[in-house]
Amino acid sequence: MIKDIDSLSQPIINIYSQIELDLIKEIARRFDLNDEIGGTMEWQLKKLDESGVLNADTVKVIASYSEKSEQEILNMLKKAQLANINMAELEEAYRQGSITVDPMNIKTNSAFAEVLELSYKELSNTYRLIQTKALESAKQAYMNVINRSYIEVATGTYDYQTAIKRAIKDMAKNGISGATYKRNGKLVQYSLEGAVRRDTLTAVNKLANKSSETLCDELGAEYVEISSHLGARTHPTNPIANHAGWQGKVFKIDGSDKKYPNLKESTGYPDDILGLGGVNCRHRMFPFFPGISTPNPIRFNEEENRRVYELTQKQRAMERRMRQLKKEQAAAKEIGDKETVKKLNKKISEQSTKIDDFCKKNNLRRDHSRELFKEQIK
């Protein structure tokens, strides 16, 4: 059984963070601050003509990571499938006659293998869609730099160097889009790294929970216990979307009894995207055997949970700002904008101190993996 299942997805997220950074640099390096015809119509036409070369090079960027990412995906999913399984507890349940199937045979079970194969196919397809969106986004980002710079120079709003610096900064700040989702009726663009993080964490937990479900079916287990963590999301009116309300409890898979309510009615699993196993849900479920399993004694105060959830959301916003600054810095280096690089070094240092102080003040763990590693921006 693995305690920190989220850590399994980090190698994949790191790969796609690097891909996004490489794409930003690939776009930026195509612009020369000292171009003699910079900002003219001749320059615009020349740059538009070069877009085909950019498209080929961005495909190469993604392809260069494909073999490594495929192996990491498989390693991640194999570990995730066993993350919710407590073999010692299952063996004790088998010894006491609570289950009739030897748990040692589970790993070679065909149903288990099918769950893993389906998860791998689904996630691979998700990544392909994200990659396609990223390639389209990179092309559009390049075109935006050209067209915006040309208009600003042609209208006399800015000189060529200033226009390029501004356009490159905004391109890097916005990042490369990996997906578009609807939120409250509005379209929301996710960066490549953000889309991969969201979909990978969801897939990993979905696989772990689906494997638990399959395990319960194979063993004839009737109950599951849900994990719990401080900072679980809350909702004032929807009990299924209020993860803090049902986390840490035991539920009956089919039907209910006096002690344990029904799993689906209480958590929405597996169909409700707002509930257990839904988008961005980190909760996991484990086979539970009354009289054998030891219930998790940890219970979180709802007010404290809400406070930590709100603080965590603030921390995520600060991390996003740090990623933006580092992307801007990488792009500025590519065009030789030393002045901007110097300014961004200062801003990055200040933002790092800000995050550090915030985490220490509120007793939160700083997650450097969400800020882009230093070696990623060299």
Give the ranges of each region predicted by the language model.
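An acidic, gly/pro-interrupted, aromatic-rich
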Residues: 286
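Short, solvent-exposed loop/turn segments at the edges of secondary structure
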Residues: 276-278
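Catalytic core of tubulin tyrosine ligase-like
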Residues: 283
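Domain-core detector
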Residues: 1-274, 289-378
